Amino acid sequence: MQTLLCQPCKSLPILTASSSSSLIRSSGDVRECIDFRASEKVSKFQFHVTLSPFAFRGFSICREFAVRGAYGIRFCSREDVSGVGNGGIVAEEEIELLNKPNPLPKSENEESGKADDDAILEPFLKFFKPEEEGEGIESEVSDETDRVSVEYYDPKPGDFVVGVVVSGNENKLDVNIGADMLGTMLTKEILPLYDKELDYLLCDLKYDAEEFLVNGKMGIVKDDDEGVEIAEFARQGRPVVEIGTVVFAEVLGRTLSGRPLLSSRRYFRRIAWHRVRQIKQLNEPIEVKITEWNTGGLLTRIEGLRAFIPKQELVKKVNTFTELKENVGRRFLVQITRLNEDKNDLILSEKVAWEKLYLREGTLLEGTVVKILPYGAQVKLGDSSRSGLLHISNITRRRIGSVSDVLQVDESVKVLVVKSLFPDKISLSIADLESEPGLFISDREKVFTEAEEMAKKYREKMPLVATSPISDRPPITSSFPQGKDEEIYANWEWFKFESQ
């Protein structure tokens, strides 16, 4: 016989009967006998359990048993739980092990607390519902949008927009373009100019106004009263433009936060390419200043765009890199020969510009005789590498036997450009500068003195060449939009000017 000592727990009710009771159950070869005594004031029980030699390892209390007295008692088994009392099953708390936690029953207060938690999480649970359940939410959002009467501009990449600077710092500007969010423009995207170009474009009216202010030249007037440069603004943490400034820009896209990304540099670059196409269509030479050089030629800028002059297109032949470098800072008359915006290719030529300016019929030039030929003389024109033919019939209007009788090598002469029978050849004349036939043979100095006046008379006798007006020329092919402001700028309807 083994004795098992059990401690009372809240799951085991105390019997009020003073008499002893006996519980007996037979199951196969197992016979269990439990005797217990209890009283109303007893706080501790002692159970005596008798197990047969064939008992299981863990003892199990019977499902149903009779209890003497008016109170019911309930024991827990590893299989199930049941109790008998007053002729029926009485629901009591389960018996629990010694010093082990017992799960507390759920109360009504806890149920209400959980309901409150669900109510708090309700706004967030809608994002985890299936699409069918989310249709109602989308309809609610659309209804709220319909009730809002404000219409925002929807920026798209490539749009030209007008905006107002509302805030900023040394790194970026916040620009209002009428969209649902403020646009962002980085400082480097604000100014359409490069640092190296500022020295060329900056004009000090006190010193170099006469040299700087020429027809058709773009520049920036230096204001000493302000005394603060762009770099100084950045060091002070201030935006490079004032709040309220109206800016023109191109939409590049959106940032990760959804704000429109703007660029004034890209916008003005498109305008610059458009103006370069106009210059090329006019087919007129322009003046540029050389800013850099490399082994292939010289570099300059037109309307802020980088342009290249190959050394083969220079009027004066360059033999060494030193001679090429000496051209930096000088001004050249050039003409645009090739451009490609997609490849950022802009090629210039000094030769073509020089020929257009100085090789027109009726132009007076100075030259040097470099070679004597049986039918004339080859004359080098100025400091250029170009030369023309002075035919024997154009030396003087009096008959001569040999060219060497009137001209010598390295002799300086003044010649007049005349019409050539061959388009690619340069034809020169001294006979048209004579005020009387044979004056070059008798008094060549007088011929050179009267050269300007005689050249002017020659040009007056030239037939007028009909030039097509600009309106009749074919339109310029450009990606830059043409038309009114409301057609160019996508947000023009939102942006309105009001006079005060």
From Swiss-Prot:
What triggers production of this protein? By light.
InterPro entries in the record: NA-bd_OB-fold (IPR012340), S1_domain (IPR003029)
Q: Where is the transit peptide?
A: 1-63
Main subcellular location of this protein, as a coarse class: plastid
Which keywords accompany this UniProt record?
Answer: Chloroplast, Plastid, Repeat, Transit peptide
Keyword flag GTP-binding: no
Pfam families, alphabetically? S1
SUPFAM superfamilies reported in the protein's UniProt record: Nucleic acid-binding proteins
Q: Where in the cell is it found?
A: Plastid, Chloroplast
> What cellular component GO annotations does this protein have?
chloroplast; mitochondrion; plastid
Q: Does the keyword Zinc-finger apply?
A: no
Q: Which CDD domains match?
A: S1_RPS1_repeat_ec2_hs2
- Assigned protein family: Belongs to the bacterial ribosomal protein bS1 family.
How would you summarize the oligomeric state and partners of this protein? Answer: Interacts with CRP1 and PRFB3.
- Which protein are we looking at? Protein PIGMENT DEFECTIVE 338, chloroplastic
Q: What organism does the UniProt record list as the source?
A: Arabidopsis thaliana
Q: Taxonomic lineage per UniProt?
A: Eukaryota, Viridiplantae, Streptophyta, Embryophyta, Tracheophyta
Point out the gene that encodes the protein. Answer: PDE338
